[in-house]
């Protein structure tokens, strides 16, 4: 059996990880595992985990590692992840990366670092629109809805994420530089990091991303 194909999308909040993860997962037939989406699902369902994560997310802070790791490990243990998966928003701290590395053992992940300037991040967060029903990501300027306020994919309502408020975005960026950016050096040292220019159009980013990945092996 082939080794699982584990792709980690690293980058600042709003760098375009979610947008590209959906496309990449579809292109490679792999599940898209987003810790942010998993937490938002838990928030919506008002689970104990969602209640614990709520305050951290609303403030732009990271949820404590132990909560993230339990949730993530349970998700990637599901049968749909056996051939691999696309990780979006995980790992985000050195302890998360180390714990995940131990779990992967001899499997080497491919880590893609989305390089995007802070000014671009602020602009993208300010205009982001997310579908309440299917989670599709659009943007008021860069991916405008065909019908105002409605999702292009399923026509449900598009909303702004509460953590895209300007003050929270500033805090998320600060937290990113302090706690997540050190992972770039960590994975560089491990020899598994590939840099991606995330300032290009979504289509050009996708082409560059596919160019950084090895060709898909036959099943
Ligand atoms: P999470 O949901 O992971 O948020 P994030 O990493 O902050 O990333 P975003 O979803 O904001 O951005 P993205 O890079 O996916 O960009 P997108 O494609 O949407 O996490 C939320 C919270 O959960 C965290 O703050 C934390 O509290 C908690 N959490 C999650 N994981 C955790 C972990 N591992 N540890 C601890 N806590 C955790 O794009 C943004 C916008 O730009 C969109 O509108 C899009 O249309 C547009 N856009 C995208 N690409 C382009 C482009 N190339 N050109 C123009 N516009 C573009």
Regions flagged by a language model, labelled:
Residues 1-219:
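Glycine-rich phosphate-binding loop of ATP-dependent small-molecule kinases
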């Amino acid at each position: 059996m082939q080794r699982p194909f584990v792709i980690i999308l690293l980058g600042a909040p709003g760098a375009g990880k979610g947008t590209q993860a959906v496309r990449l997962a579809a292109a490679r037939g792999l599940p898209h595992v987003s810790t942010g989406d998993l937490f938002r699902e838990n928030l919506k369902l008002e689970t104990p985990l969602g209640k614990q994560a709520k305050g951290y997310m609303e403030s732009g802070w990271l949820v404590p590692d132990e909560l993230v790791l339990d949730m993530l490990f349970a998700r990637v243990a599901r049968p749909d992840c056996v051939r691999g998966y696309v990780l979006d928003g995980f790992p985000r701290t050195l302890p998360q990366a180390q714990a995940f590395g131990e779990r992967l053992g001899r499997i080497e992940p491919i880590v893609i670092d989305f390089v995007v300037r802070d000014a671009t991040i602020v602009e993208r967060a300010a205009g982001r629109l997310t579908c309440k029903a299917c989670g599709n990501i659009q943007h008021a300027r860069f991916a405008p809805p065909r019908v105002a306020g409605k999702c292009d994919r399923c026509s449900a309502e598009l909303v702004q994420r509460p953590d895209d408020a300007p003050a929270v975005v500033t805090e998320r960026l600060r937290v990113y530089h302090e706690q997540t950016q050190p992972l770039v050096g960590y994975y560089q040292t491990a020899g598994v990091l590939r840099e991606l220019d995330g300032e290009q159009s979504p289509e050009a980013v996708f082409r560059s991303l596919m160019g950084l990945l090895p060709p898909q092996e036959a099943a």
